[in-house]
Amino acid sequence: MDIAALREEYTRHGLSRDDLNVDPFKQFETWFKQACESQLLEPNAMSLATASDQGEPSLRTVLLKYFDNQGFVFFTNYESNKAKQIEENPYVALLFLWLPLERQVKIRGKAAKISTAESFRYFTTRPRGSQLGAWCSEQSSVISSRQLLEMKFEEIRRKFAQGEIPLPSFWGGYRIVPHYFEFWQGRPNRLHDRFSYTLQEDNTWEIHRLSP
């Protein structure tokens, strides 16, 4: 299969310095709303890159659950590989890719666990099946079969058949506090528009156009 000729010409939008908000969180919010309004499949899907204390990288897709000017929050099992790497090295990167809009956003920052109370508030909004799934999945561990996983799900479902399902002690959220944003807009002839925001010591953001 010849994949060398697979390419698209990006022609939808341009991005100039005058288009940008001085606040990268507000700029992200604008683009995120446009991605949602375009009815893209899971516009909150983001690639999360972590690395161990030995520098070995890992990458996976997780779902952004909310964000504000304090950071970007996702939820996971605190015993998963990603959580173990964050414990060793809290510096991570995010990537949002919205191909139909010919856009991507890259974010670098530091991850930290949110409070149990904040995790609990989100956990109570999850569908009951997702709450049960959090209890029965020992994320990233080796299992012998899917049947074993489904049997454990039924066991947990019976255990919590009555009343509310409690928050697992091993499950919760992380907040990624950014120190760098990059907004990328595809353009014709691969002359893409790229702008970076870098956090300064006085908590202002320095904006630069980058070569594509």
UniProtKB/Swiss-Prot annotation:
Binding site for FMN: 60-65, 75-76, 82, 104, 139-140, 184, 194
GO MF entries: FMN binding; pyridoxamine phosphate oxidase activity
EC number(s) recorded for this UniProt protein: 1.4.3.5
Co-factor binding comment: Binds 1 FMN per subunit.
Cofactor(s) named in the record: FMN
Keywords in alphabetical order: Flavoprotein, FMN, Oxidoreductase, Pyridoxine biosynthesis
Matching InterPro entries: Pyridox_Oxase, Pyridox_Oxase_CS, Pyridox_Oxase_N, Pyridoxamine_oxidase_dimer_C, Split_barrel_FMN-bd
GO biological process, any: pyridoxine biosynthetic process
Signal peptide: none
Protein's UniProt keywords contain Acetylation: no
Catalytic activity: pyridoxamine 5'-phosphate + O2 + H2O = pyridoxal 5'-phosphate + H2O2 + NH4(+); pyridoxine 5'-phosphate + O2 = pyridoxal 5'-phosphate + H2O2
Residues bound to substrate: 7-10, 65, 122, 126, 130, 190-192
Lipoprotein in keyword set: no
Pathway field: Cofactor metabolism; pyridoxal 5'-phosphate salvage; pyridoxal 5'-phosphate from pyridoxamine 5'-phosphate: step 1/1; Cofactor metabolism; pyridoxal 5'-phosphate salvage; pyridoxal 5'-phosphate from pyridoxine 5'-phosphate: step 1/1
Record family assignment: Belongs to the pyridoxamine 5'-phosphate oxidase family.
PANTHER family registered for this protein in UniProt: PYRIDOXINE-5'-PHOSPHATE OXIDASE (PTHR10851:SF0), PYRIDOXINE-5-PHOSPHATE OXIDASE (PTHR10851)
Role description: Catalyzes the oxidation of either pyridoxine 5'-phosphate (PNP) or pyridoxamine 5'-phosphate (PMP) into pyridoxal 5'-phosphate (PLP).
Subunit structure comment from the entry: Homodimer.
NCBIfam families recorded: pdxH (TIGR00558), PRK05679.1 (NF004231)
Name of the molecule in the record: Pyridoxine/pyridoxamine 5'-phosphate oxidase
Originating gene: pdxH
